């Protein structure tokens, strides 16, 4: 397995094909080769995961400005179905974090479907995101087989990539961090009583 920056038109075409395979979207809803090209040339992050020479996953973010400071807007993280639940999404996000820090960003944001439990687990447990915004039907009608016919309501995830709580999350082997007045303490599992106390 290899993770690497994507820089060539042929690789961008593979990303477009992965978008169609992963989400089942029409060409109306894909991020196109010209947009991926500009993204890479103007400060975005585009990383692919390869199994031998086959691209099996990718993460893409666009440069942006929020409150006068540079951020990355992570628009897509996609993994082919047969490669899911093996830590590949997390590995891609950690690479995205490294590159975002290198170019001077403190914040990476993205939206995710609150009905997708696996995404919530990755975002909160593995990465340490916070959510302060719920966006109503943010993308309008989608051609995706996953979202077709439903509103595209989303949480807006904020990933403060230099913050200590994020460093603890991405370096932790535990499942959950519970914040207490004294300090944050990692635990291996979360009982119902502990969850209610949190």
What are these regions (language model features)?
Residues 1-81, 135:
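A conserved beta-strand-loop-helix scaffold within acyl/acetyltransferase catalytic domains
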Residues 70-81, 174-189:
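Conserved acetyl-CoA binding element of GNAT-fold acetyltransferases
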Residues 100-113:
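Conserved GNAT acetyl-CoA-binding A-motif
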Residues 137-170:
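C-terminal "cap" of GNAT-fold acetyltransferases
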């Amino acid at each position: 397995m290899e993770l690497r920056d994507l820089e060539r038109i042929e690789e961008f075409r593979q990303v477009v094909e992965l978008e169609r395979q992963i989400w089942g979207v029409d060409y109306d809803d894909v991020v196109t080769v010209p947009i991926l090209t500009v993204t890479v040339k103007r400060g975005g992050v585009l990383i692919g995961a390869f199994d031998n020479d086959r691209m099996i996953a990718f993460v893409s973010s666009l440069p942006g400005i929020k409150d006068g400071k540079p951020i990355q807007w992570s628009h897509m993280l996609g993994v082919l179905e047969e490669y899911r639940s093996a830590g590949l999404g997390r590995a891609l996000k950690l690479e995205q974090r490294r590159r975002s820090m290198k170019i001077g960003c403190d914040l990476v944001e993205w939206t995710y479907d609150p009905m997708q439990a696996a995404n919530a687990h990755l975002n909160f447990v593995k990465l340490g995101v916070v959510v302060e915004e719920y966006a109503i039907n943010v993308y309008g009608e989608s051609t995706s087989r996953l979202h077709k016919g439903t509103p595209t309501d989303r949480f807006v995830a904020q990933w403060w990539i230099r913050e200590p709580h994020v460093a603890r999350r991405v370096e932790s082997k535990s499942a959950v961090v519970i914040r207490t007045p004294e300090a944050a303490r990692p635990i291996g599992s979360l009982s119902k009583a502990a969850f209610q106390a949190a």
